[in-house]
């Protein structure tokens, strides 16, 4: 795999968890809170041809990315709720590549997922912003990754995930002068 491909896949680098701090918590919470507006701005004024352009060779189209983030963050919302209400629950993985090929992703306009993201992130922010430092230590089990993850880890991962996909779109726009 070439360096260019790696950079295009991970334009902001890989996710790296950070130790708990109030400063980091505020930063990640702001990432969650403002993500819907960031992705909406990233796709603003793109035409159908641009929306159907893969962000890299072999990658998803912008259209698929927007729907993927909605799918992923719906799962995140449920994972936080499960982690807060159950003792170390095993979360349900999903086949994101297959989900990206389903009828809703292929046929519905992105404004459906953009609207969903605004509502979803308002709810997720309300839950996560009220988690105590002790509650952030609660865990979920991800069977596909074979590991136990704290809610703190999940907060950082989903804050990163949103920025990661916004960067896919904005870097594509920059490369193509859109």
Description of each model-found segment:
Residues 1-16, 52-97, 125, 137-178:
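Short, contiguous alpha-helical
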Residues 20, 99-112, 144-153:
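Acidic/His metal-coordination segments adjacent to aromatic residues that form catalytic metal sites
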Residues 22, 28-29, 113-114, 164, ...:
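Short leucine-rich amphipathic alpha-helices used at interfaces
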Residues 26, 30-33, 63, 67, ...:
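A generic "alpha-helical surface" signal
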Residues 29, 33, 45, 56-63, ...:
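Alpha-helix initiation and capping sites
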Residues 30-42, 100-137:
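Acidic/histidine-rich alpha-helical segments that form the ligand environment
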Residues 42, 46-49, 87, 131-134, ...:
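A short secondary-structure junction motif
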């Amino acid at each position: 795999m070439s360096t260019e491909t790696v950079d295009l896949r991970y334009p902001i680098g890989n996710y790296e968890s950070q130790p708990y701090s109030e400063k980091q918590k505020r930063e990640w919470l702001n990432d969650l809170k403002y993500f819907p507006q960031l992705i909406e701005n990233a796709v603003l004024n793109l035409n159908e041809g641009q929306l159907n352009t893969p962000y890299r060779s072999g990658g998803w189209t912008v259209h698929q990315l927007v729907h993927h983030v909605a799918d992923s963050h719906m799962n995140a919302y449920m994972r936080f709720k499960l982690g807060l209400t159950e003792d170390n629950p095993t979360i349900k993985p999903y086949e994101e590549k297959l989900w990206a090929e389903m009828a809703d992703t292929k046929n519905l306009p992105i404004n459906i997922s953009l609207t969903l993201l605004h509502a979803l992130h308002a709810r997720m922010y309300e839950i996560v912003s009220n988690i105590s430092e002790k509650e952030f230590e609660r865990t979920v089990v991800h069977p596909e990754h074979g590991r136990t993850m704290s809610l703190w880890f999940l907060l950082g991962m989903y804050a990163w995930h949103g920025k990661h996909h916004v960067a896919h779109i904005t870097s594509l726009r920059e490369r193509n002068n859109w």
